[in-house]
Amino acid sequence: SSAASDVYKRQVEGNRLLGRCRSRHVWNANESSGNFGALLLRDVRCIYGCHAAKCGFGTHVELLEMCELKAHREKVTDEELKSKLDEFHDKFNVEISCEPEELVRAARTSVALDRLVEIHQLGAMAYYYEGFRGNDYENIVTSVIAGNTLLTGYGIPVAGECEVKNAQAMKIMSLLKAGGSFSEFYAMDFNDDVVLLGHDGPAHFAIAEEKVKLVPLPLYHGKPGKGLSIQMSVKPGNITILSVCEGKNGIFLLAAEGEAVQGETLHIGNTNSRYRFPCGARRFMDQWSKAGPSHHCAIGIGHKVSELKKLAFLLDIPIVVVE
């Protein structure tokens, strides 16, 4: 019958999706998610334990040490450094205002991050570190954004502010071939009925309207130090935002479909874009917030709610869709 045929088609599509997820990083038994640095304690959204990650997705979270990253960084060769600088100029639109010393500092850290990912077989990572002002680790953590953006673009998403669950959301979007860029809500334009999202952390090349810019920031937003950051807008068209949430009954997914639209944004070294949702900006923000997510989310291109529902069913995780 037609109904039976539809059920069979959905099962086949679901099996393909699960197979795609299991064949890559998050559900691959040979790979882990990484967590290095420390929690951003002033943000309660970051209190999401490794146990929750394991129970929700079967993800092993490797606790990484800054001293290991420092050791890898000190062993970077001149050849590796030159190759990474060439990669920067190939993948990024490097602003002329970027100081050569900052490019070298970021490139050295990027090589060390690559090595960390390879050694620990990481499929995703979350990070944050402050420490005492002027320490060696601050020099490292203020130079990670370029390297983390490269990793994100290569399918190993990196979430800032140590939010493990957002790294998981980014990974899901990456596996769905939707990108998955680190972002957060920061403004609303009621006249244009849009919501603005952005972040100074890792971006994803696949969703950028133009080549991702590498720009200098004389002071990081709400964090110590200075260094390089990225600047981009999401290409106009259909988008999906996804958040992995933790409620009183455990892990659940929160998703919404909308549209990235053109318009004015702040040029401050962020992934700034404007988004319009069918229910309108006011109702969207009201319903999204009442679901109880953190203010971070993963942005991907295309409408992916149908696939996310199948994934949630196969993993036995609830999903809430804001429509």
Task: Annotate each PLM feature.
Residues 1, 12, 37-46, 128-135, ...:
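Gly/Ser/Thr-rich loops at beta-strand to alpha-helix junctions
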Residues 2, 54-64, 178-179, 317-321:
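Structural alpha-beta junctions
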Residues 3-8:
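Short, small-residue-biased leader/transition segments that mark boundaries at the very start
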Residues 19-139:
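A charged, amphipathic alpha-helical module
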Residues 64, 121, 128, 179-187, ...:
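Flexible, glycine/charged-enriched surface loops at secondary-structure junctions
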Residues 138-157:
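A short, gly/pro- and small-residue-rich
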Residues 152-267:
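C-terminal catalytic subdomain
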Residues 223-323:
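Extended hydrophobic packing segments that form well-structured cores
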